[in-house]
Amino acid sequence: SVYVKASTVDIRSIIEPLIGHDLTVTQSKHSTKMSFTKSNDEYVMRELMRLIGNGTHHSTMRMNPELFGITADEKKALLKGIADVTGYIRKSNIAFGQEGAHRVYIEIPGNWYMVIDIANMLKAIDVPVQTIDFGHPNFRDGKLVKYNEGKPNFWKKEHQVKIFANEFLAVGFNIQHKQE
């Protein structure tokens, strides 16, 4: 709860000046939602839509090819923003139980293209991706173990881009508890 509130403050302090508008924060038992309303005619909205390929749902957003031409520092800032929202670093993210092999997971639900865009953006700044786990039945339940246990939708999970934490330091997080 403390982390969620701290994260919300961190994210708001970054986004609100960019959009020139206060975010509305709504909390429930299991989620925190931040939203804002602006006219699609406003410049910031036109630019935002252009940069996400006019995607109107998380599953239809793409990185505009122009983003791959921005400076390395701008790419890091973009990736840091993505990681703040959908990146995780937990004790359980250790690779194969190896000491010092912690990983950052960037989780992308239902968008095959954004996974590749993020991996290519990381590659462009020389941050290697350790692995990508796609939310696909061959990756998540290839031997049909969970399926045969009566869980036919077990495989329907987010895609995960996994990066070793020491490599991800070049990008980092704005959110303090994730960075620590």
Where are the regions a protein language model picked out?
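Internal intein/HINT superfamily modules and their associated LAGLIDADG
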Residues: 1-180
